[in-house]
Amino acid sequence: MSRFRIADTRVKILLVRLRQIGDVVFTTPTFAALRDHFPSAQLTYLVEPAAASVVAGNADLSAVIVAPRAPGVRGFVADLALGRRLARERFDLVLDFHGGPRAALLTWLSRAPCRVGYEVSGRAWMYTQRVARPRELRPRHSVENQWDLLTAIGVPPPDRGRYPVVMPLVRDTATQVRQRLASHGVAHDARIVVMHVSAGNPFRRWPLEAFASVAAALPAVDARVRVIVTSGPSEADAAAQVIRDARERLAPEVREQVLACGEFSLAELRALVDDAALYIGGDSGPMHVAATTRVPMVSLYGPTLPARSEPWRAGSLPALAVEVHGLACRPCDQRVCEPGDFRCLGQISPGRVIDAATQLLLRNG
C-alpha cells in the first residue's frame, strides 16, 4: 500500500466519525498524534449532533462540522449539499473512521486527493487508500483498530500514555453541575460515586436490581459517599427504579445518600465524573466519556471484552474490569440472546462489583 506523504505540513485534514459516542471518543487520541505528525495541519472533524460535544472545544481541532442526519430523499439532498461544502474546503486528506454508507459518501464527495478508509464491499472504491476492516470480535482495542488509518499514512503506533482519550472539560458547565449538586444537598467534600445504569445497546445492560444492590452497599464503605445515579435521556425511569430499590434496603438516616440530580448532558456528565471519587457502569458511551477523566472506574463487560474497549488512558489511572470468564459465546455479535436473558451480564454478581468499588474507594480515600 502506498503511504500518504506531504512535504508541506500545512495540510488540511478531515476526520470523519459520525456517531456512537464511544466510537467518537475512541478517535480522540488521533488528534494529538496527527498534530505531532503534521504540526501546522488544519484538523476538521465531521460528526452528527448526538456526539458533537465529545469533540467540541478540543484544542487540537481547527473546526468541527456538525452534520444532522435526515431520512429519505431530504437527507440525501442535504448530504449532497454538505459534500459540496466539503469539496470547497479543499481538504488534502480525509480519514474515514466510520466506514458506513453515509460517511463513505461524504468522504468521496469531499474530492480530497487522498481518502483513507476501510476495505468494505460496495464502498471501497470511494477511497484512494484502503485498509483491512478490523474483525469485529478480534480482541484488539478499538483505538488501535481506528489507528490503522493513521498507520496507512505513516503515523507511528499508538501510545495510550501519550495519546489518551480526550473530552475537554467546559468550566462553566462544571460550575453549573456543582451548583446543582449543592441544591440536592451534596456537600462539597462528598465522595461522589457516579453510577450509570443504562446503555444504548440492550445487550450491555446489567440488571437494575443488581445496580440497586451495589448502590445500597456503598454508603457503608464511607459515610461521605453519595451515589449519583444517572441514565440515558430516555431512561430516567431506570435511574428512578434503582434509587427506589436501593433506598428500600437502607436505614432511613442514610437513604438520601443514593440520589439523582436530574438529567445530565454529555458535557455535564463529563463534569460530574471529573469531581467524582468513582465511576461505575457498563461498556457504553458514558463509560468512555468517564475514561477521559482521571477518576477511578469499575467497568462491567458482558458480550464485549475489556481488551477491545477498556478505558484508553494511562495505565497508572485506576480502572477495574468485571467480567465473566469461561463462556464460549463471549465475545459475541450481540444478536443471538433474547433481551433480558444475557448470561454473560447475568452471571456478574453485585458482590463482585461491590468488592471492586470498595477496593478503589479505600485505595483512594
Q: PLM features: residue spans?
A:
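Catalytic machinery of carbohydrate-active enzymes
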Residues: 1-365
